[in-house]
UniProtKB/Swiss-Prot annotation:
It comes from the Eukaryota. Residues 257-361 are annotated as: Self-association (via N-terminus) to polymerize octameric septin 12-7-6-2/4-2/4-6-7-12 filaments. Residues 55-62 are annotated as: G1 motif. PROSITE patterns: G_SEPTIN. The lineage of its organism: Eukaryota, Metazoa, Chordata, Craniata, Vertebrata. Belongs to the TRAFAC class TrmE-Era-EngA-EngB-Septin-like GTPase superfamily. Septin GTPase family. This is Septin-12. It comes from Bos taurus (Bovine). Filament-forming cytoskeletal GTPase. May play a role in cytokinesis (Potential). Involved in spermatogenesis. Involved in the morphogenesis of sperm heads and the elongation of sperm tails probably implicating the association with alpha- and beta-tubulins. Forms a filamentous structure with SEPTIN7, SEPTIN6, SEPTIN2 and probably SEPTIN4 at the sperm annulus which is required for the structural integrity and motility of the sperm tail during postmeiotic differentiation. GO terms for cellular component: cell division site; cleavage furrow; microtubule cytoskeleton; midbody; perinuclear region of cytoplasm; septin complex; septin ring; sperm annulus.
Length: 361
């Protein structure tokens, strides 16, 4: 064997990890300016955030959404005596652009009036799950185009806030059945609605019963343990998981308390301040959805829930693209009997998309 042509050692065949070099000795390079570039681009394009609120009528869903974003996002439509109760679940959504300190947020809120209000609630979750999957399908149809937009409009539901009635007992069979299906399709954040109707002791006991029900029935709500990326995430998310479901109170009216204006509900016993942790846990819900985990909710939606849907849909496709802008996402037809001619299976024709990514909200 030629001594000059030695076989490489196992250690040398491995890809070495890149070293971190400091530029301070050679002068300023400007790498940190990338953050400024990203900030300018993000502020120009704005952000998209889509939430869904699910729960029975009268639990304060509309008020809670308005309290979260301190805007009249949704007008409450409590059915009166002369307004007939809808016979089927109907989904409604509204889109607003909220701007704060130059940052624009395109917020879409989907409401589910009629959920759980009927005598027979069998499969009342089908329209909700169908709507969630429909948004995944829309995004997929845009994504698989050969010529597609640089910025695909995102209508996927990033978070579903599930309002639990303040019964003080445990989760109902309807809640358990629906949550088992819902948590596999979207990020779910359960909350105890109208928590001011419970005492502090009743609220804590109710929370522990709900946590036990979720664990017993293998319902994994957001933030999921399996998605903690590092030690800091584990510490923060563990504290959040200990408090879920949050006991919340919504209010969209201001009152004077000790010379200051506060959001709250006025009762004959006093004023319930929604921003006061001694009164309710609304600040924890707001911080989770907006201040600390908004981008993480979007990332998990894209990388986990949408990815699972995309894999299933692409596995159903058994044909390659046959032309520009065309993708077959229909399942393959069954094999034709011997001696007969197989008819072509149905296919969905994807339209060409126009590039309008430069448009702002």
């Amino acid at each position: 064997m030629d001594p000059l042509r030695q076989s490489p050692s196992p250690s040398s065949s491995r890809a070495s990890s890149p070293r971190t070099l400091s530029c301070e000795r050679l002068g300023y390079v400007g790498i940190e300016a990338v953050l400024d570039q990203l900030k300018i681009k993000a502020m120009k394009m704005g952000f998209e955030f889509n939430i869904m609120v699910v729960g029975q009528s009268g639990l304060g869903k509309s008020t809670m959404v308005n309290t979260l974003f301190k805007s009249k996002i949704w007008k409450s439509t409590m059915p009166g005596l002369r307004v007939p109760m809808p016979q089927t679940l109907q989904l409604h959504y509204v889109t607003h652009v909220i701007e704060e300190n130059g940052v624009k947020l395109k917020l879409t809120v989907t409401d589910t009036p009629g959920f759980g209000d009927q005598i027979n609630n069998d499969k009342c979750w089908d329209p909700i799950l169908g709507y969630i999957n429909e948004q995944y399908e829309r995004y997929l149809q845009e994504e698989i185009l050969i010529t597609r937009q640089r910025h695909i409009p995102d209508t996927r539901v990033h978070c579903c806030i599930y309002f639990v009635p303040p019964t003080g007992h445990c989760l109902r069979p309807l809640d358990l059945e629906f949550l088992q299906r819902l948590c596999r399709a979207v990020n779910v954040v359960p909350v105890i609605a109208r928590a001011d109707s419970l005492t502090i002791e009743e609220r804590e006991a109710f929370r522990h019963r709900i946590q036990d029900d979720l664990k017993t029935h293998s319902i994994e709500v957001y933030p999921q343990k399996s998605f903690d990326e590092d030690v800091n995430d584990k510490i923060l998310n563990s504290k959040i998981r200990e408090r879920i479901p949050f006991a919340v109170v919504g209010a969209d009216r201001e009152h004077m308390v000790n010379g200051r204006c506060v959001l709250g509900r006025k009762t004959k016993w006093g004023i319930i301040e929604v921003e006061n942790m001694a009164h309710c846990e609304f600040p924890l819900l707001r911080d989770l959805l907006i201040r600390s985990h908004l981008q993480d909710l979007k990332d998990i939606t894209h990388n986990v829930h949408y990815e699972n849907y995309r894999i299933i849909r692409l596995k159903e496709s058994h044909a390659l693209p046959q032309g520009p802008g065309w993708v077959n996402l229909a399942p393959a037809p069954p094999p034709a009997p011997t001696g007969t001619r197989a008819s072509p299976g149905p296919a969905k024709m994807c339209r060409w998309a126009e590039d309008n990514s430069d448009e702002d909200f």
